């Protein structure tokens, strides 16, 4: 188990699991280099005290392109590679992509809406 702490990531103050902090900073930094990403929301165990070292990091990525086009773009693949390579592939990620403005009322989006905004393109 872990402790949830207030952390400054980029220019945002978020509540996150202390043991995932370095990964979250890398997510925000890596997102800056992918112009397809508008916003990233962290959700799931990484914002709760039930998080463990083995927990994956759940992020919802919102972007301007349709899902199929975004996920196969070189920019987005490089973003995903930077996350995986950051700690020699020791940390796993669950990355969900949504086109900005095309969100639906699914249960997963309800959970995401309770998450912490890690990154917003300025």
Task: Enumerate the predicted regions with their spans.
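Catalytic core of pol beta-like nucleotidyltransferases
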Residues: 1-39, 47-53, 64-122
């Amino acid at each position: 188990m872990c402790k949830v702490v207030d952390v400054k990531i980029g220019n945002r103050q978020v509540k996150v699991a202390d043991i995932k902090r370095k990964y979250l900073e890398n997510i925000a930094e890596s997102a800056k280099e992918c112009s397809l990403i508008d916003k990233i929301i962290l959700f799931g165990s990484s914002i709760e005290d039930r998080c463990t070292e083995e927990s994956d990091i759940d992020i919802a990525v919102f972007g301007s392109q349709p899902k199929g086009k975004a996920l196969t773009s070189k920019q987005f693949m490089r973003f995903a590679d930077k996350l995986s390579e950051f700690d020699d592939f020791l940390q796993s990620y669950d990355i969900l992509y949504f086109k900005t403005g095309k969100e639906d009322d699914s249960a997963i989006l309800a959970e995401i809406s309770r998450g912490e905004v890690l990154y917003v393109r300025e």
